[in-house]
Amino acid sequence: MTAQNPNLAALSAAGVSVWLDDLSRDRLRSGNLQELIDTKSVVGVTTNPSIFQKALSEGHTYDAQIAELAARGADVDATIRTVTTDDVRSACDVLVPQWEDSDGVDGRVSIEVDPRLAHETEKTIQQAIELWKIVDRPNLFIKIPATKAGLPAISAVLAEGISVNVTLIFSVQRYREVMDAYLTGMEKARQAGHSLSKIHSVASFFVSRVDTEIDKRLDRIGSRQALELRGQAGVANARLAYATYREVFEDSDRYRSLKVDGARVQRPLWASTGVKNPDYSDTLYVTELVAPHTVNTMPEKTIDAVADHGVIQGDTVTGTASDAQAVFDQLGAIGIDLTDVFAVLEEEGVRKFEASWNELLQETRAHLDTAAQ
């Protein structure tokens, strides 16, 4: 049997599920995904429009399938739907052993609804149900953004018995609304007669983008106190989110009543954990966010960094909420408008995924045009 990397094995033993934030057909065909499962403790996969756009634009892996779809008269949207759901279905199949071994907690693959629907509740619900049926795998997650329009969609999709990955969460306030949407969805699922133990959810809390935005504002202020706070907000924000998670899923009567009927916790997932600032440790958003019942989805570069030199020292989150709040108090005191920061990040997050989706449309259209010649 192949040995797991000790650093990543230690991370897993501390209660953090290691997921890969990437997917391509090359990765599936080459056996690379299976290799990461066997040697780097990977037990899940997340995707987004940027990842699929990158996969489609590199090489010729998809040419034959797109040519076949073009011959059948498939349009751009249908082609994207087929190509992406085929990859996700294949990844789901690769991860079945991890899904079975974890009683459905891990072995998960996420696919995102069209980001152009981020502010349209009913269309998001409709597409989530369609994607669930097309992929047709029990270890699938449907990714729905935590926009105001996304929140009721999350509840409605969970109520259908569909597992959901809530994405683009930046603030603790919005995270509370996400947990409320989860509990509402599970209550409706119970009323509809669904088996609650089979419905899973994670809440994807974005980390590095918070530092990127706040550091930019701290640099503009330029005082010594401001500069000393650089690189602290992302981790502090996530630690406050974890304290809020425990408050809801360990202490609330509302969750307890669902737990009796088999409902699982909605695990926090640390997303955007690739370090963007070269001044910071490239394992910062992994080693500083170790906590039980969490997921960390990482680009392969970050997984490799943790494997090579990540120092895992057990739980680095529980009991840190007061220190994390102190960081936020200091940020507020020197003039950082956190409400504005989180609003900007949500809007920017949706816009980035929309831009990637539009690039994916253009890339696919070019492939279809080439195939038709």
From Swiss-Prot:
Presence of keyword Cytoplasm: yes
GO cellular component, one term: cytosol
GO molecular function list: transaldolase activity
Listed EC numbers: 2.2.1.2
Subcellular localization: Cytoplasm
Catalytic activity entry: D-sedoheptulose 7-phosphate + D-glyceraldehyde 3-phosphate = D-erythrose 4-phosphate + beta-D-fructose 6-phosphate
Enzyme active site: K143
Family classification: Belongs to the transaldolase family. Type 2 subfamily.
Listed name of the protein: Transaldolase
Species of the source: Mycobacterium tuberculosis (strain ATCC 25618 / H37Rv)
Lineage of producing organism: Bacteria, Bacillati, Actinomycetota, Actinomycetes, Mycobacteriales
Gene behind this protein: tal
